[in-house]
A protein has these predicted regions:
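Aromatic-residue-lined binding/catalytic grooves and analogous aromatic/hydrophobic interfacial grooves
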Residues: 2-371, 388-390, 407-410, 421, ...
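Beta-strand segments within the central parallel beta-sheet cores of soluble alpha/beta enzyme folds
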Residues: 114-116, 327-330, 345-346, 398-408, ...
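C-terminal catalytic domain of Rieske-type non-heme iron oxygenases
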Residues: 289, 293, 426-428, 435-436, ...
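Well-ordered alpha-helical segments within folded domains of soluble proteins
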Residues: 307-317, 376-387, 453-463, 518-527, ...
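Extended, hydrophobic alpha-helical segments in both membrane/secreted and soluble proteins
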Residues: 308, 375-389, 398-415, 556, ...
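Long alpha-helical scaffolds in large eukaryotic adaptor/regulatory proteins
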Residues: 393, 469-472, 571, 623, ...
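Acidic/histidine-rich catalytic neighborhood
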Residues: 408-468
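Acidic, turn-prone loop/beta-hairpin segments
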Residues: 599, 606, 620, 625-648
């Protein structure tokens, strides 16, 4: 069902007029009543159900142990009953697309259990087909819309010794030496336009292919598939001093122990989560990745586009998982198609638009209520991922395919942006600085014009279009037009208390500790704010972040790790990691980390895991400011360590070791050739290094010049003190490796 309707076009100008008249709450109220979607806010991501395995006589047990292996993507549960050790090994096979549960015991003939499938869905049927149990159904209704995803799960087993049988939806195993339970799940979903797939045949084929193989062969295929991604990167922050301590207690004790092996594990866990939740050909990681046990999860576990889904993919390129970016890129392709209807019907504009949320059906209209949903710049933020993919890979064919998407997003803003009456700046209106109320409405409304995030996003998007058009030798007239339009936009502003303004007006409250820090997009993930190029804005961003505070929702703290790293303050970034690694055992506490290392908003949101994973790399290496900065935000806690396999823009793979806080060894592997500019806090020695001069000739490191910021006369700015560094150029050849030692 569409989430746009024709009368929205009639009311958006009325909302805009109220904003320009300073009647922000009236504008927001009108938008909620007349502009926001009435019948469809997107469909939820839903759980299939549960596997239950009961073991008669296992109520009294000892030596209980469980683990998740980040080396092999398997879980192990082990315990003893009456002197017998039982083990349950579970994996969800990348290679075979089935769940496998292997049951073993230390004595023969001891595996006896009953297994069944249950689901919270209502429209379901459980059946037995020979040696298979099936659970079939259809996704649930939501907000008056009928679920249309038909699904089937199939379960069977293979045993060594003993007997097995299926009856009344229960799989029974008795007296086996070993058993493997197999579960396949399939749906009729092919893509957002096609649900004609045959879920029954798909589930049958997955299951029958899997059971035809030896378990150990299947396990090896799964582990090999996983390791091709996981083993690309390693992080060493020291020995494991607490190997015998359970994960929840390690998190609970982190503030006292400074358990940096846990930090390295948390980093690895972030990569594990992306590998498992974002495989090419599938859907992108949503608010909970793929790990949702409810029919109606918080925020429907969809794709929130005003920070969250973007944060999910911050680690993709930099931690050497570029292929796993593809599901998000495919989503961007698809919302650029569905977003045409929203642009035309809601705004009367060409191009495409995405507001703050989408789902598997790629809705793009303004959903929920105006305080969050009236934000039309989601497409601009997503387009940054197309650009970043190009910067990391240098893939011109990819850029050529992405350019029409970027161009049409840019065309939409070219048509809908208007001149505001106070400064005559070109702005987006109506919009909001995501989910944050402002003083112009006495804290009662978010709706505004010319918000800093919008300006930064469109500045980036239009510059990316201009650069790409010239690289491809196309659309010269449109590129020239956008260059002129950029000059008419609102610049960044530094407000009365030295802060980077979040809004066009100086409304920022120094006591505001809102979870979103949207106006700092230009610092991270953007690159408009730099200690070298824009020191005043750099200081203002720091002032804003100090006043925003540290403790917050889990995902907000993950973002702040990245921001403090960009502010070159490793100790403060480490403090945010410490805050994020605060144990949360229930839904009532503030943000932190659950006992299994899932990020706590609360509830669980996966973006915090991914944000912190990216932030740890930002502490060790940055490549956004025209050069590769080695150890830019190394905390005092990490005196010695190494990271291998991380990726800098331009396609440079780095192995980096340090001792006493200084680079000791660096290996640069050049994938595409070109100039590699390095900045280091200590001198480097090695063949090919020369002192850097002028602009970096590598086009993947070019940075557009921003508009001159406006600084309030009352603002008291601090001088940005930069550490002495050494800047080198290295001309590289594709496929070559270069080794340097620190002095």
């Amino acid at each position: 069902a569409s989430d746009v309707y024709k009368r929205q076009l009639e009311y958006i100008p009325k909302v805009r007029r109220l904003v320009f008249e300073g009647k922000y709450l009236e504008a927001q109220t009108l938008a909620t009543e007349k502009v926001m979607a009435k019948t469809n806010s997107g469909m939820p991501y839903q759980s299939f159900g549960d596997l239950h395995i009961s073991f008669p006589g296992h109520t009294r047990y000892s030596d209980y142990y469980r683990e998740l292996s980040l080396d092999s993507a398997r879980t192990i549960v082990r315990y003893k009953v009456d002197g017998v050790t039982y083990q349950r090994e579970t994996l969800t096979s990348f290679a075979d697309q089935v769940v496998m549960v292997r049951l073993t015991a230390s004595q023969p003939g001891k595996i006896t259990c009953n297994a069944n499938l249950t689901t919270p869905h209502q429209d379901v049927m459980v059946a037995t087909e020979g040696e298979e149990v099936t659970l079939s159904g259809v996704s649930s209704w939501h907000e008056g819309l009928k679920g249309k995803v038909e699904f089937q799960g199939r379960m069977t087993a293979r045993t060594q010794g003993g007997t097995r049988s299926c009856r009344d939806g229960v799989l029974s195993i008795e007296g086996a030496d070993e058993a493997v339970i197999y579960i396949s799940i399939a749906t009729n979903f092919t893509n957002y336009k096609d649900i004609t797939g045959n879920q029954v045949e798909r589930a049958k084929n997955y299951l029958r292919r899997a059971v035809s193989k030896d378990y150990m062969t299947s396990r090896k295929a799964h582990v090999d598939f996983f390791k091709q991604y996981m083993d690309r990167v390693s992080l060493d922050l020291g020995i494991d001093k607490y190997a015998g301590v359970t994960t929840d207690m390690r998190v609970q004790n982190f503030k006292e122990t400074k358990d940096d092996f846990l930090v390295a594990t948390y980093f690895r866990f972030g990569r594990y989560l992306l590998i498992c939740s974002s495989q090419p050909g599938g859907q992108p990681a949503n608010l909970q990745g793929i790990w949702n046990d409810k029919l109606f999860p918080s925020w429907d576990s969809k794709y929130t586009c005003n920070i969250n889904v973007e944060m999910n993919y911050w680690p993709a390129e930099v931690t050497n998982l570029s292929e796993l970016h593809e599901p998000l890129i495919q989503l961007i392709r698809e919302v650029s198609e569905t977003g045409r209807e929203s642009a035309k019907i809601m705004y009367g504009a060409d191009g495409w638009v995405l507001h703050h949320n989408t789902d598997i059906w790629r809705v793009t209209g303004a959903i929920d209520k105006a305080p969050s949903g009236l934000w039309p710049t989601g497409g601009a933020w997503l387009c940054r991922h197309l650009w970043e993919r190009y910067l990391y890979t240098g893939d011109m064919e990819f850029l050529r395919s992405a350019y029409p998407i970027m161009k049409e997003a840019g065309k939409f803003f070219d048509e809908i942006m208007v001149k505001e009456p106070l400064h005559n700046w070109l702005v987006v209106c109506p919009s909001n600085s995501p989910e944050n109320t402002h003083a112009g409405s006495n804290g009662k409304a978010t709706t505004a014009a010319g918000c800093t995030l919008d300006n930064q996003l469109i500045f980036d998007l239009w510059n990316q279009i201009i650069t790409t058009a010239r690289l491809l030798g196309t659309d010269a007239e449109f590129a020239t037009r956008l260059e002129q339009r950029l000059k008419e936009m609102a610049p960044m502003q530094i407000g009365r208390w030295g802060q980077l303004q979040e809004w066009m007006m100086d409304w920022d409250n120094p006591q505001d500790v809102h979870r979103h820090v949207s106006h700092l997009y230009g610092l991270f993930p953007g690159n408009q704010i730099s200690p070298y190029r824009t020191p005043e804005l750099f200081d203002a961003a720091r002032t804003s972040l100090i006043h925003r505070g540290d403790p917050s929702t889990g995902w907000s703290m993950g973002w702040k790790v990245c921001l403090w790293a960009r502010l070159l303050d490793g100790d403060h970034a480490y403090k945010l990691i410490t805050d994020q690694l605060t144990l949360v055992r229930n839904e009532k506490k503030k943000g932190g980390t659950y006992p299994n290392l899932f990020d706590a908003h609360p509830p669980f949101q996966i973006d915090g895991n991914f944000g912190c994973t990216a932030g740890i790399v930002e502490m060790l290496m940055q490549s956004h400011d025209g050069f590769i900065y080695l150890l830019p935000a190394l905390p005092a806690q990490w005196k010695e360590g190494s990271v291998n396999g991380i990726i800098a823009r331009g396609g440079f793979e780095l192995d980096l070791s340090w001792k006493n806080g200084k680079v000791s060894r660096l290996v640069v592997k050049s994938r595409h050739g070109g100039n590699c500019r390095l900045r280091s806090l200590n001198p480097l020695a090695g063949k090919g290094l020369r002192k850097a001069k002028g602009e970096n000739p590598n086009k993947l490191y070019a940075i557009p010049e921003i508009l001159q910021p406006i600084i309030n006369k009352e603002a008291k700015l601090n001088k940005v003190e930069l550490k002495k560094t050494y800047l080198y150029d290295l001309e590289t050849k594709a496929g070559e490796e270069y080794i340097f030692l620190g002095k």
